[in-house]
């Protein structure tokens, strides 16, 4: 160990190199610090972040794991690694390291656990983790974000009254967040409260007009309300914004077109839906109905 250059001075020098964009020089200094001070996590964090910038995630994870192998009780490094894995969409590994932490000691770890389970679509475990988090942490900026994820989870579990309850709690802070308004729209739609649903969908669109998903739900809601022209417009906007619209959305668009007597358009959209999904029964029936209308076999749908 070089006692003429104490840790803090050498760490500051490395960070200065990094701030100047001299990442290779900084990396070399950080790695020397790790060799000389393997018990100090600061250089480990900095190397992991430099590796992340270079896309070298595996090396960063291995480095942080090596620290924990020597100091498995270090909660700060474990939490850092959990967040690092989370940030890089490595959900299973994040869970492995975050589960080690006691919720009462590191409540935020339970939030990250819930988020990881949510991303893995393990909704029951996600729900348990997030409920645990909000029971422990009564005063935190993450509380209302946890409510948003709980609302999403309850939608996936088809428990719409519970979803509405969590959405209303999140609304205290996030009333102008487009996604929360979309959550309200989806929840109200599934509860049959279409007048409420349409207001939420329209607000979500106003807040984020370039986000596709509110247009899809607006289309569904307008269709239920019998406003077929707005349903058609919404579905078309959704298709415009998304690269790979599925068969269901083309089927819904075609059905809206039938309602406003755009039978040729409807037939074209039904054919697109069938091409995307050859087993789509609604598209098959729709093609037959549209063809019959165009041939005069049956009257236009009212």
Residue ranges and their predicted role:
Residues 6-36, 46-53, 87, 115, ...:
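Alpha-helical segment of the N-proximal tetratricopeptide repeat
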Residues 32-33, 66-67, 100-101, 132-136, ...:
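Canonical positions in the second alpha-helix
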Residues 7, 41-42, 75-76, 106-110, ...:
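Helix-start (N-cap) detector for alpha-helical repeat units in TPR-like alpha-solenoids
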Residues 12, 46, 80, 112-115, ...:
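Canonical tetratricopeptide repeat
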Residues 19-20, 53-54, 87-88, 119, ...:
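Register position in tetratricopeptide repeats
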Residues 36, 70-71, 101-104, 136-139, ...:
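Structural marker of alpha-solenoid helical repeat scaffolds
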């Amino acid at each position: 160990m070089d006692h003429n250059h104490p840790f803090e001075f050498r760490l500051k020098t490395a960070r200065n190199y990094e701030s100047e964009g001299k990442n290779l020089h900084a990396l070399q200094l950080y790695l020397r610090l790790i060799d000389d001070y393997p018990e100090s996590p600061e250089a480990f964090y900095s190397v992991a972040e430099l590796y992340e910038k270079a896309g070298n995630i595996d090396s960063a994870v291995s480095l942080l794991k090596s620290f924990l192998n020597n100091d498995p009780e270090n909660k700060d490094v474990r939490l850092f690694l959990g967040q690092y894995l989370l940030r890089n969409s490595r959900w299973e590994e994040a869970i492995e390291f975050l589960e080690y932490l006691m919720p009462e000691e590191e409540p935020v770890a339970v939030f990250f656990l819930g988020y990881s389970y949510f991303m893995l679509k393990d909704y029951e475990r996600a729900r348990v983790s997030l409920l645990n988090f909000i029971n422990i942490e009564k005063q935190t900026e993450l509380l209302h974000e946890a409510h948003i994820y709980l609302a999403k989870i309850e939608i996936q579990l088809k428990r719409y009254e519970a979803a509405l309850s969590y959405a209303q709690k999140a609304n205290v802070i996030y009333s102008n967040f487009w996604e929360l308004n979309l959550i309200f729209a989806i929840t109200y739609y599934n509860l049959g409260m279409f007048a409420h649903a349409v207001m939420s969908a329209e607000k979500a669109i106003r807040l984020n007009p370039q986000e596709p998903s509110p247009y899809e739900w607006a289309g569904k809601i307008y269709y239920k309300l019998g406003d077929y022209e707005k349903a058609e417009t919404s579905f078309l906007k959704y298709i415009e914004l998304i690269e790979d619209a599925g068969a269901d959305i083309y089927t819904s668009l075609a059905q809206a077109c039938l309602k406003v007597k755009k039978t040729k358009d409807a037939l074209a959209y039904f054919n697109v839906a069938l091409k995307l999904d050859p087993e789509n029964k609604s598209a098959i029936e729709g093609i037959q109905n549209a063809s019959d209308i165009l041939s005069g076999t049956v009257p236009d749908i009212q």
